[in-house]
């Protein structure tokens, strides 16, 4: 009996593998496999959401302005690229404003971070309440690609009219902001399961999307608008 107990003690005692500082015993069997599987799943997730072929990325950006209900596999590369383009655009417009009007506005990067965090969060909460089939990643990808409508609606007036014509901006708002909002609405109409909630959710998300565009334009791109002024 004593010999059998001693044999069990030797079997269960942690041993150091050759060339390793980590103890190894029968208790730790499968630990390396779990770590490898975790690393593999993390790499697959990063590869799926952060690596997009260039032509596929261009196609997704173009399709973000087409009114279609088809939603491609979600990724973060397109929304991330839109974030940096918007940051550069807002900083350019903010630096061109008069000093008195620019100093009253919050930092462009702060406003952009709040926009990036709050708009997708509000959209996701709304679609969850309405019983939508969209996941969080799909919602972030949908709203992120819709930001290219913001880029075109604010960037084209700067290139052609230097923000001198408000009519031209509102025309761009109607075209590019309207197309991106229409695509959001079509995707939500397909994904929301509760018929009575479709109108409310689509109206809310599209309104937030367009109001954020109007806010960013007047606060950071308009040359004479004073944020918080009387």
Each model region followed by its residue ranges:
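Selected alpha-helical membrane-embedding segments in polytopic membrane proteins
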Residues: 38-136
């Amino acid at each position: 009996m004593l010999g059998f107990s001693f044999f069990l003690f030797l079997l269960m005692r942690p041993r150091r593998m050759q060339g390793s500082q980590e103890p190894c015993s029968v208790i730790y069997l499968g630990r390396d496999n779990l770590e490898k599987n975790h690393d593999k799943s993390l790499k697959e997730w990063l590869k799926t959401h952060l690596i997009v072929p260039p032509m596929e990325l261009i196609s997704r950006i173009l399709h973000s302005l087409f009114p279609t209900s088809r939603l491609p596999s979600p990724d973060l590369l397109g929304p991330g690229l839109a974030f940096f383009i918007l940051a550069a655009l807002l900083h350019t417009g903010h630096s061109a404003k008069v000093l008195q009007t620019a100093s009253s506005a919050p930092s462009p990067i702060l406003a952009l971070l709040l926009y990036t965090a709050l708009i997708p969060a509000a959209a996701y909460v709304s679609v969850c309440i309405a019983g939508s089939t969209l996941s969080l990643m799909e919602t972030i990808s949908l709203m992120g690609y819709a930001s290219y409508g913001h880029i075109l609606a604010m960037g084209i007036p700067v290139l052609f009219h230097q923000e001198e014509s408000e009519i031209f901006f509102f025309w761009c708002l109607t075209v590019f902001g309207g197309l991106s909002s229409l695509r959001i609405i079509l995707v939500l109409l397909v994904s929301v399961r509760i018929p009575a909630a479709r109108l409310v959710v689509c109206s809310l998300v599209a309104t937030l999307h367009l109001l954020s565009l109007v806010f960013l334009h007047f606060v950071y791109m308009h040359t004479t608008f004073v944020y918080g002024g009387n």
